[in-house]
Amino acid sequence: MQQVKKVVLAYSGGVDTSVCIPYLKNEYGISEVVTFVADLGQGDDLEIVRQKALNSGATKSVIGNLVDNFVEKYAFPAIRANALYGEKYPLSTALARPLIAENLVNLARELNADAVAHGCTGKGNDQVRFDLAIHALGPDLQIITPAREWKMSREEAILYGEKFGIPAPVSKKSPYSIDVNLLGRSIEAGLLEDPMQEPDEDVFDMTSSINNAPNAPKDVEIIFQNGFPIAIGNEFLSPVEIIQKANSLAGEHGFGRIDMIEDRVVGIKSREIYEAPGLLLLIKAHKELESITLNPDVLDFKNIVEKKWGQLVYQGFWFGPLKQALDGFIDSTQSSVNGKVKIRLHKGNAIVIGRSSQNNSLYREDLATYSKDDIFNHKQAEGFIYMWGMSNKIWAELNSKKNK
């Protein structure tokens, strides 16, 4: 590896990235470590995070406001894709990685840095997401990954940081790893590594427990235009405000917790806890609206596309050609996804209780009704069934002869 003089480090203020600063300087001999702090709506005072980077030895620390871009270019496409990895996880953390990587590369170009770095460990998913995105956007840049090479446990990393005056934000006894952005929270490690261990209530922050959620249900109406959520109730909101409002409503009523065994990119299974109340609520509403506005064959094929889209994003291929091709298909389906969905929030549940589309509904009450207003031609069903089952009938006749 060519000697690096200046590196741009993706920095969160957590254990691994904080320890990376002295490690890069002392173990790699890099003279300038510039940190990039991504504002993804996590709610932290990022000036404190920036100052922590400087106190930890960073030459310079830059904060990038990515919230609007994160919602409009990453979260909203995921909603249109009904993206749920493993049929549960709405990619709240995974969606942030290519955006951070893109800005990391841009800052490295701006500062004429030789390399970029991140604090991802050797058995996590984020290392794959960062590396693949950086390879796609800055193939000439070196990627330095201290946490993948230092072979320290989390406890040892905390001790290493303390030698250089870096305070640990977690307890050594139960060192949870928590990642937060506007879309949600991911929690792992510590006691949660036992898949039978129930999470303590203090693990959660965005969602109420069922016991503490309101006793009275709350009905919420979400309006979509071209597959994008544009209003909650009668209030038309910006994309960021939509996520914030959905988080508040769903979280208050205890909806949006996920406890799952997840198949990581590197081939191992891990126990993951997520909170993503708003994103899960919006995906649920969007998928319901599609049920009334899209043809059955489009829905069937879109289900296949959605699964693959979610896998590609989870696996780090945001900038890959297949993901871009699937984007084109999804975009082509969304012009008719206009209307509103009513959902009842109550004690951890989000139950669809209504849906409508004024101009794009494929539901015809006069065809679906069993009342006197029914215009469906029942007599034609006999001919349809005869043709529909013809191949099965021929097969059955042939096999019945063979069995005699």
Swiss-Prot record:
Pfam families (UniProt xref): Arginosuc_syn_C (PF20979), Arginosuc_synth (PF00764)
Recorded metabolic or biological pathway in which this protein acts: Amino-acid biosynthesis; L-arginine biosynthesis; L-arginine from L-ornithine and carbamoyl phosphate: step 2/3
One biological process term in Gene Ontology: argininosuccinate metabolic process
SUPFAM superfamilies, sorted: Adenine nucleotide alpha hydrolases-like, Argininosuccinate synthetase, C-terminal domain
Catalytic activity: L-citrulline + L-aspartate + ATP = 2-(N(omega)-L-arginino)succinate + AMP + diphosphate + H(+)
Top-rank EC class of the record's enzyme: ligase
CDD domains: ASS (cd01999)
Protein name: Argininosuccinate synthase
Taxonomic source organism: Prochlorococcus marinus subsp. pastoris (strain CCMP1986 / NIES-2087 / MED4)
Gene name linked to the record: argG
